[in-house]
Design a protein with these regions (language model features):
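Short glycine-aromatic motifs
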Residues: 16, 46-48, 80-82
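Short, intrinsically disordered terminal segments enriched in charged and Pro/Gly residues
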Residues: 1-12
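Residue-level marker of regulatory loop/turn positions in helix-turn-helix DNA-binding domains and
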Residues: 13, 30
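Residues immediately within or flanking Cys/His clusters that coordinate Zn2+
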Residues: 18-19, 25, 32-37
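Structured aminoacyl-transfer and RNA-binding surfaces used for tRNA recognition/handling
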Residues: 52-280
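Cysteine-rich micro-motifs
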Residues: 31-49
Length: 280
């Protein structure tokens, strides 16, 4: 499934245009008719440092994270999603990973395969995650963490059975509406970059949501499963279409906090006491 083949009415209604990034060659959607890059390249600086792009969050540290998390979950709760408690960070229901690395990992493989129903449908969650693959980048990039929370909204569709909760168009509408009307982000600053996603045996078309040079979220439209007889190749692996169509999103809690704080790095926004202690 390619975005060029999928009709998304929201793009037309909101006057988005599809462009090709002059740096990466990836397609992206924007309201800015003069934009030439996707927003996530070496030519795109962080524009929010010293000038926050999310308003209304003057606090720092735990208070900031708690407030940001509540705003996200409340938005989706008010839009017919059930709040689900986070899963453990030790992925004891998985035999392929030890740690919970994303919110969708909570539901792989049992729910995503269709063998087990989801705890709610649609649902929203803020899942603590641990990613040791990012250790080398911590402290160098100013944005990487090994422990973080992935805020998310998920929906599990069974189109063959006529069970559709919502799919691509509504997912993008939720994301854009929340960014603009809940967090006060200037809509012309938002870009949606087309870049397929894969992980945990599943894959699908995806949109990376970029604001101010920072990737705030990824919207994945999961409709593929890894299979040796598959005829779709993504990142060197073969996939085939599966019965479920799954909305798999991930919004970085700490990155939202950083965009709201406008501090030099993400660490001053979420660990102000630790940074102050280290500076002493």
């Amino acid at each position: 499934m390619a975005f060029g083949e999928v009709h998304i009415p929201f793009w037309e209604e909101s006057e988005h245009i599809r462009r090709t990034c002059s740096v990466t060659g990836l397609y992206f959607w924007t309201r800015d008719k003069n934009r030439k890059t996707s927003g996530d390249t070496h030519e795109d600086p962080y524009t929010f440092i010293g000038s926050p792009i999310i308003d209304g969050f003057p606090m720092r540290g735990k208070e900031l994270k708690d407030s940001m998390r509540s705003s996200f979950l409340d938005y989706f709760s008010e839009n017919s999603h059930s709040k689900v408690d986070p899963y453990p960070v030790i992925a004891r229901w998985r035999d392929d990973i030890h740690l919970t690395i994303a919110s969708i990992a909570d539901f792989q493989p049992h729910v995503t395969s269709g063998r087990v129903p989801p705890p709610a449908n649609p649902l929203c969650i803020s899942q603590p995650c641990i990613r040791l693959t990012d250790v080398a980048a911590v402290g160098r990039s100013g944005r990487h963490l090994t422990t973080f929370e992935m805020m998310a909204h998920h929906a599990f569709n069974r189109p063959n059975d006529g069970e559709i909760v919502y799919w691509i168009d509504q997912c993008v509408r939720f994301c854009d509406d929340m960014l603009v009307n809940t967090f006060g982000i200037n809509p012309i600053e938002i870009t949606y970059v087309e870049n397929p996603w894969s992980g945990g045996g599943n894959a699908g078309a995806a949109l990376e949501v970029i604001v101010g040079g920072l990737e705030l979220a990824t919207l994945v439209f999961m409709n593929l499963e890894e299979h040796e007889d598959g005829d779709i190749i993504i990142k060197g692996l073969t996939y085939r279409e599966m019965d479920l169509q799954i909305i798999d999103t991930g919004y970085g809690l700490e990155r939202f906090c950083w965009a709201a704080a406008g501090t030099p790095t993400i660490y001053e926004a979420i660990y102000p006491e630790s940074v102050s202690w280290l500076k002493e």
